[in-house]
Curated annotation (Swiss-Prot):
Signal peptide: 1-27
Species lineage: Eukaryota, Metazoa, Chordata, Craniata, Vertebrata
Sequence similarity: Belongs to the serpin family.
Tissue: Expressed by the liver and secreted in plasma.
Name assigned to this protein: Alpha-2-antiplasmin
Gene Ontology CC terms: cell surface; collagen-containing extracellular matrix; fibrinogen complex
Species of the source: Mus musculus
Annotated site residue numbers, Cleavage: Q39, A40
Sulfotyrosine found at: Y484
Length: 491
């Protein structure tokens, strides 16, 4: 079982001029609060917060508004481009986050961040709108929010729940068109706040707690006086393995931190697991798809060497590399560590590096309000639990990939992972694990194989090249050239 929950908050605040009192937009009403509009939706987007402030821009340039009409159902080509764009955005975003993080493990939802940015794009104009599209690798005008909205509303029922809410300062003048599109596309609508910080904080944090089923509490500790608008979205993913792991087979085993040190972890095990997996060459990276129900997968991306960084690995992973619905499942012995990850991130610096610094200096958001607004905060929090039942959470190139001839797949070294939607191949969550048990004291490796390698060596020796077991230092090579399926990235 996999359980993942994510929260993103985008804040806009006043830099000059008076600030008004706070009020929220939401798909779910909070106790004791009245929404501005009466229709409610129960769509839950990953919690995201954008804070906006008032800012004086001086003379306004001529507006360049996006066309207001988009197809209600995207074409197959538009859907494919969306999936490719989301993979490219995921690579850009996670590479930068990993560069500056000091955590041994990371998890975030690129879908949540993209939803928040596309929500903001509903009110963006001119260069600000172009910048948002460029960073999201989309050239679809105002149709980007529609594409993302159509995607998440058509995810498998019972697997993904999305919630959105807008908080506005009381009396803040917001445009009706922005409110209407926010509600229609994201299920978000305004609900008045009291203007009392303690009470408003409690209400916001209670909504976050309910939207993430109690996994994210006390998300906000304060509301700056300059804040006039908050955009929040929350995603809850509860994925059950299509083939469950037997808890009685879970046992302590070694996870190799590097060539010298290991930590003890709870390792789930299955003797014959339906796995789609292959070896990507140059550099050698193993990729395995563990299927969930409802067309989702937990995708492990594990280099066969220790000295790697996230940017280096992701540079070799295009959408075509990961998304291979024609790849056949093979009965495989697997070992997979149980995980419990939690991450809180401030994304202002990361988004600025991606090319959105304008959001935090002088954006054109007159599609939201004639007031001068600036984004002052972007906060994101995600949690993930991986257990026997499943997961809960919160240029043209030619690539050669080899179906590995081994009948075992052991996740016992640092790896990246994705939660992927398998129908079109959109990444919902992404993360990296370098130490699944950071509270444990690392130990020097013993001068012997780990228990899992001994077991594999005894039972499957005929399947290994030269009789070697698949250990941390083994370089894999296929037996025959015809075993290599050839894949090319789209131009």
């Amino acid at each position: 079982m996999a359980l993942l929950r994510g929260l993103l908050v985008l804040s806009l605040s006043c830099l000059q001029g008076p600030c008004f009192t706070f009020s929220p937009v939401s798909a779910v009403d909070l106790p004791g609060q009245q929404p501005v509009s009466e229709q409610a939706q129960q769509k839950l987007p990953l919690p995201a917060l954008f804070k906006l402030d008032n800012q004086d821009f001086g003379d306004h340039a001529t507006l360049k508004r996006s066309p207001g009409h988009c197809k209600s159902v995207p074409t197959a080509e538009e859907t494919r481009r969306l999936a490719q764009a989301m993979m490219a955005f995921t690579t850009d975003l996670f590479s930068l986050v990993a560069q500056t993080s000091t955590s041994s493990n990371l998890v975030l939802s690129p879908l949540s961040v993209a939803l928040a940015l596309s929500h903001l794009a509903l009110g963006a104009q001119n260069q600000t709108l172009h910048s948002l599209h460029r960073v999201l690798h989309m050239n679809t005008g105002s149709c980007l929010p529609h594409l993302l909205s159509h995607f998440y509303q058509n995810l498998g029922p019972g697997t993904i729940r999305l919630a959105a809410r807008i908080y506005l300062q009381k009396g803040f003048p917001i445009k009706d068109d922005f409110l209407e599109q926010s509600e229609r596309l994201f299920g978000a609508k305004p609900v008045k706040l009291t203007g009392k910080q303690e009470e408003d904080l409690a209400n916001i944090n209670q909504w976050v707690k309910e939207a993430t089923e109690g996994k994210i509490e006390d998300f906000l500790s304060e509301l700056p006086d300059s804040t006039v608008l908050l955009l929040l979205n929350a995603i809850h993913f509860h994925g059950f393995w299509r083939t469950k792991f037997d808890p009685s087979l879970t046992q302590k085993d070694f996870f190799h931190l590097d060539e010298r040190f290991t930590v003890s972890v709870d390792m789930m095990h299955a003797v014959s697991y339906p796995l789609r997996w292959f070896l990507l060459e140059q550099p050698e990276i193993q990729v395995a798809h563990f299927p969930f129900k409802n067309n989702m997968s937990f995708v492990v991306v594990m280099p066969t060497y220790f000295e790697w960084n996230v940017s280096e690995v992701l540079a070799n992973l295009t959408w075509d590399t990961l998304y291979h619905p024609s790849l056949q499942e093979r009965p495989t012995k697997v070992w997979l560590p149980k995980l419990h990850l939690q991450q809180q991130l401030d994304l202002v610096a990361t988004l600025s590096q991606l090319g959105l610094q304008e959001l935090f200096q002088g954006p054109d958001l007159r599609g939201i309000s004639e007031q001068n607004l600036v984004v002052s905060s972007v906060q994101h929090q995600s949690t993930m639990e991986l257990s026997e039942a499943g997961v809960e959470a919160a240029a043209a190139t030619s690539v050669a990939m080899n179906r590995m001839s081994l009948s075992s797949f052991t996740v016992n070294r640092p790896f990246l992972f994705f939660i992927m939607e398998d129908t079109i191949g959109v990444p919902l969550f992404v993360g990296s694990v370098r130490n699944p048990n950071p509270s444990a004291l690392p130990q020097l490796q013993e001068q012997r194989d780990s228990p899992d390698n001994r077991l594999i060596g005894q039972n499957d020796k005929a399947d290994f090249h030269g009789g070697k077991t698949f250990g941390p230092d083994l370089k894999l090579a296929p037996r025959m050239e015809e075993d290599y399926p050839q894949f090319s990235s789209p131009k």
